Structures are given as C-alpha cells and as structure tokens.
C-alpha cells in the first residue's frame, strides 16, 4: 500500500500494528482508552502495544506521576510522558532497542461532564524515536473538544491519537502537511490551539509558524502570543478573566501608529478598571489580529507578514490573540467560552463603521445576528474618538454611504456619529443602552489608522 494513499483510521492503526519497528505504551486519562482501543481491535496489537493504562483515581495518578500540577495541564502531561517513556526504555531497550522505534502516547482530558457545564479540553503528547536507538522527539497539543456528547468526544480523541502516531512515523514532512494529516477525518470536532515540538525529527520547524498554520488550516479559532513568555493556549490567559480586546490590522506599526494602538489598549484597561470601582481585579489586555484580510476580497496576510506585526506589538510589551476570522462577534464567541467576566472591545470609529457596513452573508440573521452575538450580556464596545479629517478619509476607503457627523475641535466621538436610515435607529439604541461607550477625546491631537 503506497504511503501517499489516504488511509482511514482503521487502516492506519492496522498499518502501525503490522510495522514491526514501532512499539510503545499508552496512558490515557479522562476520555477512556480510545486511542489504544483502535490498535487493540484492528488486529495485530501485540506488534504495537507494550502497555495501556488509565489512572483515573487521583491518588493512583499522583503515585505514578507525582503531585503539584493540575490534572489537566501541560505540566501533568509532561510528567506522564517522563514516567511512561522512562519505564518503556528501562524495560525494553535492552531486549529490542536495536530494531525498534519506541513511542509513548499520553493524554489527560477534561471531557464533557454529565451536566454539560464545563469547557471540554485536554493535553495530548507523543514521545517517539524516528529510528531505532535514536534520541527521543516530542510533540504536545492542547485541544478543545466541540462534540455535543462524551461518547463522541472519546471517538474523536481516538481518531486524533491514531492520526498523530501514524503521522510521526509515516508522514513527517512539513509542519502544514503534518497538521493536515493529524486532523484527517476530524473536521471541526477537535480544535488544536497549541503545538510544541522538540527533537531532531522537527528540525527547522518554527513553533510560531505552526500556530499560524493551525488557523490557516481551520484547526483553531485563536492562538495566543504573550509578550513575556512563550506561546500558551488561549484558555490559559482568558480563564475567568476580565478582558479588554483591541482589534485591528496593525499594518502600520511605525512608532507613531504603535503608540496610538498602545494608548488605546491602555485607555481601555484603565476604563474597565474604573468600572470595577475599587474591586481587586486586574483586566487582561490583548491586541487582536486576524488571519483573514480586513477587506473582503483581499488576499489574507501571509505567515511572515503576521509574524512581523506580532513582533512589533510584542516589542512594545503587547500580548496578542490571533484569530482565524475577522468578524468581531467570533472574538466574543471565543472569549466567552472561557470567561463570564466583563469583556470590552476598544475600537476606533473606522472599525466601528466597518462593523456596521460589513455584509454578514454567512449568518442567517445577517447584521442583527452578528450584532447580538457581538454584544453579549458581558460585552461592551469602548469607542475611541477620531479626527474628522481622518474619519472622512476612512469612510471614503470603506465606501460607506450616508454617514454623517459633527465634531468638537476637530474630533468626532461616538454620539456625534450618525449612520444612514434605518441603521440610525439601531445605532441610537445600542448607544443609549450603553453597549457603545464613548471614550474621552485625547488631550493631544492624534490620527487614527
């Protein structure tokens, strides 16, 4: 059977079982033993499975893998990998190490609970040798499960695990094609929003490029690039946090424009902190980019261009969320998975107008549905003022029709802006209902991107 032929999960598991050079262990917690099960049911499992274990009891798990880490965390996954790999090599390297590529597959999963009130997610890891006797290589995923039931989640995890093991042994090409192979037959059932690789088998792979490739492949809705540490899953920075989001293209990041973006985000964080009125809460602020183009029909920004913008923002101490889609309501959807605290967008008038002018053809409810999803119960838009001359140019660039405004000393704020009829009635409503919150005119004149 040609290696280029696309195999289903059953065929992949059987091919691995019949390959006498690959042999390893499985440790799965939280979603059954669905990965190991594939190898056990297709036939020839003795050619692949040295051990399969699930340590559900916390005391048993602590005895095997140590204490101190959350049970569903990268730290726990790494402890599992260290333990399982160490045992495998200690027990089998002498007897069959000269002709065996060893591997240890582990996962720790928070599956959907009975009430369906949690956010199902988990960590998946694989340590393996690319050739017998070789140094170990490692790949770690953070995943989000999107299936509506626990049995379906388990099924998807099983497919993902088989795909991963098959891909490292038979399809370890470029990062993008590797990810496509790992995601085969999964669709939108599992998101991968974090990847970490190490070892000679992944030489030349760039982790940040891989994260962006996840978005381009439709495998994640967002990835995170903090300024002070290495990449983490969005869950790690959004969980139960009050959040301020500053979306933009950030195409122009010369010192002047960069300072404007920085000031807008900082102003939003200050304003939300003032809303808390003395509560000991520190909002988290993020610059938000999109892997899609700002204007419909334009080509999407490439990986190199996105990394250039990310580097420029990180150089100024900015934490970044990079989203797969451009629409603001998709950002609300993602952030509200992880927090019920206050969420605030900081937007300029030009982006506000784009949001109202955008054609939401993919939504059954069009603009009204987009607006209702954007302005969820915990969401408000802080609207940053803009100079009248810049607003005029922006409206021409957008080709927006019927917008009018007045200004104060050359500056236009949200209450001074008027869309065309009938949008003006809806605009008045969201403004009067405090979903749109005007921000103060800056003390010194500045142009907005």
Q: Which residues fall in each region the model found?
A:
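Conserved catalytic-core segment of nucleotide-activated headgroup transferases in glycan assembly
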Residues: 253-268, 293
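Short active-site-proximal "capping" loops at secondary-structure junctions
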Residues: 31-32, 54-58, 292-294
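Long, charged/polar, low-complexity intrinsically disordered N-terminal extensions
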Residues: 2-16, 24-25, 31, 37
């Amino acid at each position: 059977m040609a290696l280029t032929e696309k195999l289903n999960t059953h065929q992949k598991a059987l091919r691995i079982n019949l390959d006498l050079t690959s042999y390893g262990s499985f440790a799965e917690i939280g979603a059954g033993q669905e990965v190991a099960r594939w190898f056990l049911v297709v036939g020839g499992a003795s050619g692949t499975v040295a051990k399969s274990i699930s340590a559900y009891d916390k005391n048993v798990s602590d005895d095997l893998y140590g204490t101190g880490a959350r049970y569903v965390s990268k730290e726990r996954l790494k402890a599992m990998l260290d333990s399982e790999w160490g045992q495998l090599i200690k027990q089998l390297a002498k007897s069959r190490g000269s002709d065996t590529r060893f591997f240890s597959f582990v996962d720790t999963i928070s599956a959907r609970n009975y009430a369906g009130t949690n956010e199902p997610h988990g960590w998946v890891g694989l340590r393996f040798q690319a050739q017998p006797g070789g140094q170990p290589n490692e790949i770690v995923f953070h995943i989000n499960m999107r299936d509506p039931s626990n049995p379906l989640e388990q099924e998807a995890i099983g497919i993902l695990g088989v795909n991963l093991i098959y891909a490292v042994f038979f399809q370890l090409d470029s990062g993008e094609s590797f990810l496509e192979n790992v995601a085969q037959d999964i669709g939108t059932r599992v998101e991968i929003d974090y990847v970490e690789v190490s070892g000679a088998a992944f030489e030349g792979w760039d982790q940040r490029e891989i994260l962006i490739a996840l978005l381009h492949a439709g495998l994640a809705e967002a990835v995170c690039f903090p300024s002070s540490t290495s990449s983490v899953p969005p869950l790690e920075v959004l969980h139960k946090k009050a959040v301020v989001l500053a979306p933009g293209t950030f195409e122009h990041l010369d010192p002047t424009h960069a300072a404007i973006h920085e000031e807008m985000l900082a102003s939003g964080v200050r304003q939300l902190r003032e809303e808390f009125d003395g509560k000991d809460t520190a909002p988290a602020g993020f610059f938000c980019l999109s892997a899609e183009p700002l204007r419909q029909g334009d080509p999407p920004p490439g990986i190199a261009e996105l990394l250039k913008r990310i580097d420029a923002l990180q150089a100024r101490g900015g934490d970044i969320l990079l989203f797969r889609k451009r629409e603001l309501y998709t950002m609300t959807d993602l952030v509200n998975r992880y927090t019920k605290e206050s969420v605030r967008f900081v937007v300029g008038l030009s982006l506000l107008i784009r949001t109202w002018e955008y054609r939401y053809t993919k939504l059954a409810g069009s603009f009204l549905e987009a607006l209702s999803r954007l302005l969820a119960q915990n969401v408000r838009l802080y609207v940053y003022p803009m100079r009248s001359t810049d607003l005029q140019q922006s409206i021409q660039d957008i080709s927006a029709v019927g917008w009018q405004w007045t200004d104060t000393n050359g500056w236009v704020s949200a209450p001074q802006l008027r869309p065309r009829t009938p949008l003006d009635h809806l605009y008045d409503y969201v403004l009067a209902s405090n979903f749109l919150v005007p921000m103060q005119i800056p003390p010194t004149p500045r142009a907005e991107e």
